[in-house]
Amino acid sequence: MVFSSPSWVPRIPCEIPDSIPVGQFALEGNTSLPPQCGGRPPFVCAITGKSYSTKVLVDRVEFLSRSLAQELGWSPNEGEPEDKVVGIYSWNTLDFFALCWAVHRLNGICLPLHPFSIVPEVVAHMKRAKCRVIFTCQSLVANTLEAARELSIPGDKIYTTALPEAYLQNPEPIDQFKSVDQLIAEGEKLQRLPPLQWEKGRAKIQVAYYCATSGTSGKQKLAKITHYNFIANVMQVCMHESYAKNGRNEIAFGAIPLTHGYGLNIGHIMVYRGDTYVICPRFDMQLMLKTIERFRVERLYVVPPILAALAANPFLLDLHDLSSVQATVTGAAALDRSIAAKLNKLRPTWKINHAYGLTETGVVATLTSPHDVWHGSSGSLLPSFEIRLVKPDGTDAEGLDEPGEVHFNSPSCFLGYVGDDESNKNTFDEKGWLKSGDIGVFRKSPNGHAHLFILERIKDMIKVKGEQVLPRDIESVLLSHPAVIDAAVIGVPDELSGERAKAYIVRSKTVMEDLDEDDLADEIDEFVQGKLHESHWLHDRIVFLEKLPKSESGKVLKKDLKAMN
């Protein structure tokens, strides 16, 4: 059975544009809004209050593209897009989207690099993407220089974005690198570039972003998201939400890195429909609460751990005037229904909505509507999205309450992975539908509409604050410690982070034998912290065993470890 969006969801009323870049689509959508809907600044800095009008944003994109064309020797209609890849390794800035769209103006591809990424991850992504140009911010200059040295990228191919001065603490000197503002000032004096010459259908094959994702196979990959994929998803989300929004514009706050698919998606949507997106460099609870009061924020785009923190610490809700908030939208991880219910009790006027999707689906596939909230579900399908639930025997689920692996069909689904033919073969089924690796089931809401519930992931991946963490990455580090002879890692529930990694270890009887288990656990925890970033840390979640439960073939029985927990 093929599941589609409920009858109440408006259909996309026109053909999805396939001959323009996604930035041009978003900006043209904004400038064509009726006067009562337009005029709002698309982006506002949460710290300084600085903003640009849509007209100024359009100019900044154009000026920046001219300057980059001169700096890099690129022309809009010459050369291959794969040879024009620009990495963006930065905390959120006001010019993030101007930079992305300037690269697209030159027929290039953006490589968003998560600011939490450690140097080896940055190097791996840039190498796979054949990226030779990078923009960074002051607090990440040291990491960027280390990555550039390893990749033999010269200093004149490193540029900087601007973080608010009030936000910076002991910033690295960056005078030797040209900034976005300098490039824009130079570009204003240069001749206008020739327009992009895209034939019909070009946006379907032209990659806009190489987005990093852990993927369903358990290894980190770069997903090729086309301009058409993003345009389609913007239209899908906007049509789904139009049922409840009634053309009303909103001021929204995003607590997500713009380099994440979720953040990228929201930014394009905000501009297209004339909303205002208040941006902070990185999430800070106090800053978010102050920002809500200062800018009268109506909608919060967050990840579940943020709502969990608010539900667990109700006093936070009374520190500032949050009366403007009407809705929250969570994504990137599942929101536990108990947390939603608790927050709903604390703030009954807030509509707590959830979105579900993958980087590979162009981000959003299902979304809760304010008129049909059902805590624990992932909401209803967007228009032009189809899902099949494939059972272990390969047949499709034939109705409600019958689980199976979620397979997607949508104009927003990605092209494939960069340089990974094996994963590409395994990612699509025999019908060409995208396999999610998630087990889901459709159930009928109290209002009578089909909602998708995600039951579990097929693989052993752990989701920490929306980030997918691979147990084997932690296991590999543990096994490199001299006092560890065997190790296995599972995910365990965590109220604030969704999940956290927990390690079961068999210790050596001859190395560090003078340490008791508590001291050795502390030593191993510090060892892991020195090798991996925060989402992989173990803290007190280390248990010592005499031996790990294993099958006859030697495979660790993680289900037994989960039963112990």
From Swiss-Prot:
The keyword Ligase applies. SUPFAM superfamilies: Acetyl-CoA synthetase-like. One of its GO terms (molecular function) is ATP binding. ATP binds at residues 213-221, 354-359, 438, 457, 555. Residues 355-417 are annotated as: SBD2. Residues 284-354 are annotated as: SBD1. Its EC number is 6.2.1.-. The gene is easD. Pathway: Antibiotic biosynthesis. This is Acyl-CoA ligase easD. It comes from Emericella nidulans (strain FGSC A4 / ATCC 38163 / CBS 112.46 / NRRL 194 / M139). Disruption phenotype: Impairs the production of emerecellamide A, C, D, E and F. Acyl-CoA ligase; part of the gene cluster that mediates the biosynthesis of emericellamides, secondary metabolites acting as antibiotics. The biosynthesis of emericellamides initiates from the highly reducing polyketide synthase easB which catalyzes the formation of the linear polyketide chain. EasB produces several polyketides that can be further processed by the downstream enzymes. The polyketides are released from easB as linear polyketide carboxylic acids, which are converted to CoA thioesters by the acyl-CoA ligase easD.
